[in-house]
Amino acid sequence: MKTKILKEKQEVINKLQVGDVHDYPLNKWFPKNSWSTERKIKFTLKKIEKYYDAELAEADAIENAEEVREFAISVEWANSRMWGANPNATIRVGYDEFISGSISGSGYDKESTAIAGAFNQSEKLRGILYKNRGKIADKYGWYDCDCSLSGGVGSECFWRIFESCGYEVKHVASGKTYDAWIVSKK
């Protein structure tokens, strides 16, 4: 994961050192015609360093995350006049709580989007995917792992991924406006 980030960082820096600052996304922050190309490059290099340092710190936290024995997922549904039922997922890992916020719209699986949104906030949980990336890749073709879940694919897909990582998923409660699962190490 770190090597991929470092490689991407080096590619961006190499492109920038050639003097190609006009296609760089940060060029919208440059004052019009008042900065020299050297100053633009220096400014952009600082921004690149800051961005990739944060990416590397996150990757390091994911790689060194402690093992999660159990976590709870709950999804509450709220009615919306425009979008029908909107889910809001909460994942609890020990004393930590991660909340997705309300997911609206139509044409995709909102429940899995809410669960993925809450899951991806935790380095501990993303560490599960990182440490078991070989098992996941063999089963689901997930070779270039960014160690996060994608929403809109159906929550059943997540349960199968967790099971392939050595976890057991139990649906412990459901009702008209809520669902709850416990995911624990086998």
Which residue stretches match the model-derived regions?
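Short, charge/polar-rich alpha-helical segments
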Residues: 1-13
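Acidic, low-complexity, intrinsically disordered interaction modules
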Residues: 20-47, 51-61, 81-178
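Acidic, proline-/serine-/threonine-rich low-complexity intrinsically disordered repeat tracts
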Residues: 62-67
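A short beta-strand micro-motif
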Residues: 71-75
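Short, cationic low-complexity segments
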Residues: 78
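Active-site beta-strand termini and strand-to-loop segments that position acidic
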Residues: 183-186
